[in-house]
């Protein structure tokens, strides 16, 4: 079994290449071509070329058609997402600005920290995750009593964040959200692929309304961690498997294999 990194919005995502005496099987895991690690996905395609079986995710075709345009809140790639977030911050001078993000997207938050015009402050837990994953220390606030082993010189008092309107760009996680009624009126919040993810989640509309009720502008800026429909076909064609097995999709039948056969597996089926 060969483990290979691929481009995804979760740090450390990998595909697998499984070689047996009888066949060569590639498993994509979750992957894409529009993130920070496009070359890794292309390398996975190269290594998996002409495999006997390709098991590939099909998340995007669950919800989108091949000719669908990007949603207004969706960016072409991660770099555009960072630029869009920074522009929101720059255009809201003297306003409190908070955000939340997908905790596994280490590379995104690192680039936000590096480029944002304000000092970025994370929750203690998220700061701990980044430190453990890649050894980078960040500014943080803490609302629980756990010992994460963080640098106390980087700790920002939560009351200071609640009163801030120009210095900080800080994470509003689930614990901090309990204090939403203490946030500044007329402030700004940026939701970047954090939970709840969207309208399909029954918690999403009440979540958005909570900000509206507290006079905080709600912004969505997102960039999917999954290959878009046409990119999925590009990946399949680059690999050119003898047998394609779509998985991780509500509509696996939307994928097709121009160079071989396709199998739509059923629950409990042994291939």
Over which residues does each language-model region extend?
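His/Asp/Glu-rich metal-coordinating catalytic cores
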Residues: 1-107, 111-114, 121
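Non-globular, low-confidence helical/coil segments that flank catalytic cores
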Residues: 2, 27, 35, 128, ...
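Conserved beta-strand termini and adjacent loop/short-helix elements that scaffold enzyme active sites
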Residues: 4-6, 123, 141-143, 221, ...
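Active-site metal-binding loops of divalent metal-dependent hydrolases
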Residues: 7-9, 29-31, 58-59, 102, ...
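Flexible loop/turn segments at secondary-structure boundaries
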Residues: 10, 34, 62-65, 105-109, ...
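Short connector loops at secondary-structure junctions
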Residues: 58-65, 124-135, 139, 222-231
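Hard-cation-handling environments
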Residues: 68-179, 183, 247
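C-terminal regulatory/interaction regions
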Residues: 114-118, 145-271
């Amino acid at each position: 079994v060969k483990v290979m990194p691929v481009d995804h919005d979760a740090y450390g995502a990998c595909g697998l290449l499984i070689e047996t005496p009888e066949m060569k099987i590639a498993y994509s895991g979750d992957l894409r071509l529009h993130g920070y690690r496009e070359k890794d996905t292309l390398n996975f395609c190269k290594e998996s070329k002409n495999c006997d079986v390709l098991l590939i995710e099909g998340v995007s075709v669950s919800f989108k058609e091949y000719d669908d345009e990007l949603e207004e809140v969706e960016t072409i790639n991660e770099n555009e997402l960072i630029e869009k977030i920074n522009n929101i911050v720059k255009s809201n001078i003297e306003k409190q600005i908070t955000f939340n993000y997908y905790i596994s997207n280490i590379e995104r938050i690192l680039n936000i920290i590096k480029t944002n015009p304000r000092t970025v402050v994370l929750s203690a837990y998220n700061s701990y995750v980044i430190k453990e994953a890649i050894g980078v220390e960040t500014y943080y606030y803490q609302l629980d009593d756990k010992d994460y082993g963080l640098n106390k010189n980087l700790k920002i008092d939560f009351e200071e964040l609640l009163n801030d309107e120009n210095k900080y760009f800080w994470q509003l996680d689930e614990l901090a959200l309990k204090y939403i009624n203490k946030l500044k009126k007329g402030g700004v919040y940026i939701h970047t692929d954090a939970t709840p993810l969207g309208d399909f989640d029954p918690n999403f509309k009440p979540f958005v309304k909570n900000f509206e009720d507290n006079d905080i502008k709600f912004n969505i800026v997102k960039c999917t961690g999954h290959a878009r429909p046409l990119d999925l076909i590009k990946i399949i064609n680059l690999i050119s498997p003898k047998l394609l097995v779509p998985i991780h999709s509500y509509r696996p039948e939307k994928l097709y294999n121009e160079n071989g056969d396709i199998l739509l597996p059923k629950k409990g089926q042994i291939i």
